[in-house]
């Protein structure tokens, strides 16, 4: 679980950013042809997404299907695939926003640092600072703003170890513990 939640977003961000910058001249050539820019970017995005999702399915999917072909394993695969696509989209967003390759890779690494590490610290700070107030809805909103945390919550609730997650786990078990709640979590990941 930790490998999927930490490494998959990092690889997706870095690979997506580097691919975009390395194929920048080819994209410019295609843009000079009578093709819509939306079509060009969507084709680039789909190509990178299919390649990285295939690599994820080969590297993680085969062992999970061999040794843990249950609901938890399939949820882990689904979350991993969604995180791959989400972070490739974020990589393309960062690469389109900056023309300099070094700055674009830096933006991608900062995005990963925020989503993987900093967001959890900000959540803890807010929860400890405002512990006297009801934070259920605010916690749900903050978790929805981070696809890595949302994926972690969906997989851990499927594993039924929410007692190990403390206050957040109890809250998530109440709000997302049912099949409808898990579907809402997957739906928010899809919106990402």
Which residues does each PLM region occupy?
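Central hydrophobic cores of alpha-helical transmembrane segments
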Residues: 105-115
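Long, hydrophobic alpha-helical segments
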Residues: 2-23, 52
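Secretory targeting signals
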Residues: 2, 47-103, 107
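Terminal transmembrane helical anchor/hairpin motif
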Residues: 119-191
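Short alpha-helical transmembrane interface motifs in multi-pass membrane proteins
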Residues: 8-13, 42-43, 71-76, 180-184
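Hydrophobic/aromatic residues in alpha-helical transmembrane segments
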Residues: 12-16, 25-26, 89-90, 119-122, ...
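Amphipathic cytosolic juxtamembrane alpha-helices at the membrane-cytosol interface
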Residues: 34-46, 50
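Transmembrane helix boundary and interhelical loop/hinge segments in multi-pass membrane proteins
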Residues: 13-33, 44-45
